[in-house]
Design a protein with these regions (language model features):
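C-terminal motif of bacterial Sec signal peptides marking the signal peptidase cleavage site
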Residues: 27-30
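N-terminal secretory signal peptides that target proteins for export/translocation
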Residues: 1-13
């Protein structure tokens, strides 16, 4: 094993990419004419290129990672950042899929889902998550609605993590008209994440500024009951739910520029107790979106930064780190490293993995 390096080599990102913040990004990037914008060339490859080096996706800009463990592999869905270098907004039209059986070598499986998968959507293939239930795969995604103002959440279904995915509803699962956004904002219904509890009940969490959840019916494509607002300190966006040793963990984008913080609860519906920050602001990007999984008795933390040459606020790249817990079950803050998989357990780490 190579000696771990703890700390990124800072790579200069273009001054022409304005760091406008989330509101301006939504207003500038959330237009209906993405198809008319130029396609972004592949990023230049950093030298040297080694397996397992962060960012792990290098042939294109990627973002909003969502990992799924299935059949001995990690299936990693990512957004595709296509904004030109001079752009001041997100250009995102599709999701890409990668898989690995060792967390080092990643196979690209193409584009299983795009905005066009949802006939009622017009643009903005933002954050997503896929989950398996009873042999079928459900892909929950953020897109901009073509006829209802604002962003919406759709769900597509397939018999394989590779797709093909189809929209069985042919309508949105959640729309901006179903919730009351603060000050009339139209991007509060984004960033879906789904968790299936031990009793088989599935829950959909989502939100920007206001975190929300609702039960899902057994068919996984309909809500089952009211939408419930949560109170999480500093919540911005990007919720993700996982469970370990009977404790529920809800991590999320915290503040702006975003760190990743988390809360814990004894049940999936709370009450949630704020526990603190686990990932600091990332290089070159004010947004920060995580995915947490257990794979082969180890825990991993996926996120995005802007570390590829030419990267920036709207041209991000997916990275991964090992994740550790202490004896009390608290998450030990993440070390952002060049080779995240080489980071050794810090003092006080216990539980899963060597």
């Amino acid at each position: 094993m190579r000696a771990p390096r703890t700390g990124f080599r800072r790579r200069r990102w273009p001054a022409g990419v304005a760091r406008l913040g989330l509101l301006a990004a939504v207003l500038a990037g959330g237009c209906g004419d993405e198809k008319d914008l130029p396609t972004l060339p592949d990023p230049a490859q950093p030298d040297p290129l080694e397996p397992g080096e962060n960012p792990i996706i290098r042939e294109r800009f990627s973002s909003d990672p969502a990992a799924l463990v299935h059949d001995g592999r990690v299936w990693l869905y990512t957004g595709h950042d296509e904004a030109p270098e001079w752009g001041n907004g997100f250009v995102m039209r599709e999701w890409h899929l990668y898989s690995s059986d060792d967390m080092v070598e990643w196979v690209h499986h193409g584009v299983p889902v795009s905005v066009e998968t949802f006939p009622w959507a017009i643009s903005d293939a933002w954050a997503s998550q896929a989950i398996e239930r009873d042999g079928r795969f459900y892909f929950y995604a953020t897109v901009r609605h073509a006829t209802i103002n604002g962003f919406a959440i759709g769900v597509a279904v397939a018999d394989s993590p590779e797709g093909p995915f189809i929209d069985p509803r042919r309508s949105a699962l959640v729309t901006n008209a179903m919730t009351a956004g603060p000050n009339g904002m139209d991007w509060d219904d984004i960033d879906p994440t789904v968790f299936i509890d031990d009793d088989g009940q599935a829950y959909l969490f989502w939100g920007n500024t206001v975190p929300r959840y609702a039960k899902l019916r057994d068919n996984m494509i309909e809500l089952d009951g009211p939408i419930v607002d949560l109170d999480l300190p500093g919540f911005t966006e990007a919720p993700w739910v996982h469970q370990r040793d009977g404790t529920y963990y809800l991590s999320y984008g915290y503040g702006f520029p975003e760190q990743i913080a988390y809360a814990t609860a004894p049940t999936i519906t709370g009450p949630w107790t704020f526990e603190g920050v686990i990932n600091d602001v990332v290089p070159g990007s004010p947004t920060n979106h995580q995915s947490i999984i257990e794979f082969q008795d180890e825990w991993y933390f996926f996120y995005h930064n802007a570390e590829l040459p030419g990267g920036g606020e709207f041209r991000r790249s997916v990275a991964v780190e090992r994740l550790f817990y202490d004896a009390d079950g608290d998450i030990i803050p993440i070390t952002q490293a060049d080779f995240g998989l080489d980071v050794q357990p810090p003092a006080g780490a216990t539980g899963d993995g060597p």
